[in-house]
Amino acid sequence: DDKRRQI
């Protein structure tokens, strides 16, 4: 889960 990097 990478909330900083939403693609």
UniProtKB/Swiss-Prot annotation:
Enzyme Commission code(s) on record: 4.6.1.-
Q: Where in the cell is it found?
A: Secreted
Q: In which tissues is it expressed?
A: Expressed by the venom gland.
Essential cofactor(s): Mg(2+)
* Cofactor: how bound: Binds 1 Mg(2+) ion per subunit.
> How is this protein annotated for GO cellular component?
extracellular region
Q: What is its main location?
A: secreted
Lipid metabolism as UniProt keyword: yes
Q: Name one GO biological process term.
A: lipid catabolic process
Q: Could you confirm whether the keyword Metal-binding appears in this record?
A: yes
Molecular functions (GO terms): lyase activity; metal ion binding; toxin activity
State the reactions this protein catalyses.
Answer: an N-(acyl)-sphingosylphosphocholine = an N-(acyl)-sphingosyl-1,3-cyclic phosphate + choline; an N-(acyl)-sphingosylphosphoethanolamine = an N-(acyl)-sphingosyl-1,3-cyclic phosphate + ethanolamine; a 1-acyl-sn-glycero-3-phosphocholine = a 1-acyl-sn-glycero-2,3-cyclic phosphate + choline; a 1-acyl-sn-glycero-3-phosphoethanolamine = a 1-acyl-sn-glycero-2,3-cyclic phosphate + ethanolamine
Record keywords, A-Z: Cytolysis, Dermonecrotic toxin, Hemolysis, Lipid degradation, Lipid metabolism, Lyase, Magnesium, Metal-binding, Secreted, Toxin
Q: What is the purpose of this protein? A: Dermonecrotic toxins cleave the phosphodiester linkage between the phosphate and headgroup of certain phospholipids (sphingolipid and lysolipid substrates), forming an alcohol (often choline) and a cyclic phosphate. This toxin acts on sphingomyelin (SM). It may also act on ceramide phosphoethanolamine (CPE), lysophosphatidylcholine (LPC) and lysophosphatidylethanolamine (LPE), but not on lysophosphatidylserine (LPS), and lysophosphatidylglycerol (LPG). It acts by transphosphatidylation, releasing exclusively cyclic phosphate products as second products.
Family, as annotated: Belongs to the arthropod phospholipase D family.
Q: What is the name attached to this protein's record?
A: Dermonecrotic toxin LgSicTox-LOXN6
Species: Loxosceles gaucho (Spider)
